């Protein structure tokens, strides 16, 4: 079952563990959206944080060309991917479960942006119950240098050096022109993920985890987003791990990271249940 075009992995909860943690309530379905170039074995480590809590997890990472080329050049290819991922919830008959997102870097955040837009506007998806989101090492705004570092890391040492520099130069010119120089014009038909999520944010609780040592995503961009959302009256919290590199928070601080994610999920579930109870009274 599911969409053959998507390279995703789903792990269903174990009944005994779910019952222990959620005591008769439907267990959360956690959607993990990987950073550009992340492999499923990387995401599986994060997935286990939630599987151990009796959650069902759905893991997906958008292809590199979609993140770095299509999105940078204004093609909304990720929007159709977002639609397919949300449809999977219906394919696997978990559309009535609480939904929780765990999003990594700009690669995951760009895809998350379209999922949020669909949850706002699409008749079918608007009935889904999203309880919260964890954002790891994102979002970054118009950071060409950071994007180049991310692309260089993703290409890796196997790519010919001359080809690597050519691709980096081409990417830099395209992004600089379309997303910075011409952005006052291009934003009218393709707003960047940062501005889109600042202007039309997700209404549910959010937690931003980041590091001021991150050389790909500027920590000030994350803090600006957090402050902007808090000023809109949203439930948003954040934590600066200070020393880890980009998307290395869990690797460097596994216990602290896991505890924060689990505690936040429990808090989101409790908050969601309280809101539902108030609606029924």
Curated annotation (Swiss-Prot):
UniProt xrefs under SUPFAM superfamilies: alpha/beta-Hydrolases
Membrane topology note: Single-pass membrane protein
Coiled-coil stretches noted in the UniProt entry, renumbered to this chain: none
GO terms of biological process kind: negative regulation of BMP signaling pathway; negative regulation of ossification; negative regulation of osteoblast differentiation; regulation of nucleocytoplasmic transport
Keywords per UniProt: Developmental protein, Membrane, Nucleus, Transmembrane, Transmembrane helix
A matching Pfam family: DUF829
Transmembrane segments: 165-185
This protein's GO CC annotations: nuclear membrane; nuclear outer membrane
Keyword Kinase among record annotations: no
InterPro entries per UniProt: AB_hydrolase_fold (IPR029058), DUF829_TMEM53 (IPR008547)
Family membership: Belongs to the TMEM53 family.
PANTHER family per the UniProt record, alphabetical: TRANSMEMBRANE PROTEIN 53
Known role: Ensures normal bone formation, through the negative regulation of bone morphogenetic protein (BMP) signaling in osteoblast lineage cells by blocking cytoplasm-nucleus translocation of phosphorylated SMAD proteins.
Protein name per Swiss-Prot or TrEMBL: Transmembrane protein 53
